[in-house]
Swiss-Prot record:
This is Ribosome maturation factor RimM. GO terms for biological process: ribosomal small subunit biogenesis; rRNA processing. Belongs to the RimM family. The PRC barrel domain binds ribosomal protein uS19. It is found in: Cytoplasm. It comes from Alcanivorax borkumensis (strain ATCC 700651 / DSM 11573 / NCIMB 13689 / SK2). Transmembrane segments: none annotated. Keywords: Chaperone, Cytoplasm, Ribosome biogenesis, rRNA processing. Its main location: cytoplasm.
Amino acid sequence: MAERGQSSSAEGGASSQLVVVGRILGVHGVKGWVKVYSYTDPMVNLQQYQPWHLKQGALNSGGSSAAGTWKPVKVTGFRPQGKGLIAQLEGVSDREAAAALVGQDIGVPADLLPQSGQGEYYWRDLIGLRVKHVNGMDLGSVTRMVETGANDVVVVRGDRNSLDRRERLIPWLPEDVITAISLEDGEMTVDWDPDF
């Protein structure tokens, strides 16, 4: 699926799971606008999902934003700028206030996102799946997904129940490398050399 968000429990009274769909990268100008990185595809889809919630902190190994609490924020302006996006947030009217938001994750309620289609997956649904080689070897669990220029990468970390404790980077190539996914069984099957 196009949106690459990671799940995180809603805090502060929100009833829905929040999905990380972007991040504030920097400031734009002197009137409080912020540069935004969107994990959605196309990037401008980020504008559709309101309200936003902001949370300071990097993603932890489980894919959830680890530090801080979610705070709702209203988007009052949004537009493409160069190769990216910029947004104006309610109550943020100068460069200093905008700078205080840099590095914060943008979360939206999961129920705002469209259902994934047949054979499509949100990254948040893949985190935690057990990864099995086509010959049955257990390679570990999906800890995160990484977007690269050529193709996305599944990061698999071995544990005490797997072949070894190595971390593997497996290209997201459905049908070629990723041969099957069963969310119901919590498994992903891959045709990938375990030595890599």
